[in-house]
Amino acid sequence: MNYLKIVDDDLLNAKEDYIAHQCNCISTNAKALAKQLFDNYDYADSYKKRIRQNKNTYSKPSTIEIFGNGDTQRYIINMYSQYYPAEAKYSNDTTDQRLQWFQECLKHISKIPDIKTKTIAMPFNIGCGAAGGDWGVYSKLLT
């Protein structure tokens, strides 16, 4: 059974219980979609906790962070499935690694208590816009 439904709308208008999006692990300032989300849900801005050039403050690839309480704060899932921003170009952040990290993030999401009774909105082409992934491959992981 396919649970993927593509909706042509602004992600910020989504009515789903969770919004999940792909993040990189090192940026200290959000751009593009992450900036839009963090501007609207500042409690989910993991980038502002980071210190430039301090690896101890970076996120770890293949992990997720969940922000919000589902009541007064909408749930936001930050999926750390790329190490650097933009397209993959370094040996420690390859296209294959990003795909693997994305899969691992999906596994973490599947283990959220009561997730089977919840809905999740993700941006169309997640992992494939500025990150440069192949939607034909990524979309299959979501179905």
Model-identified regions with their sequence ranges:
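Macrodomain-like recognition of ADP-ribose-binding/processing modules
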Residues: 1-143
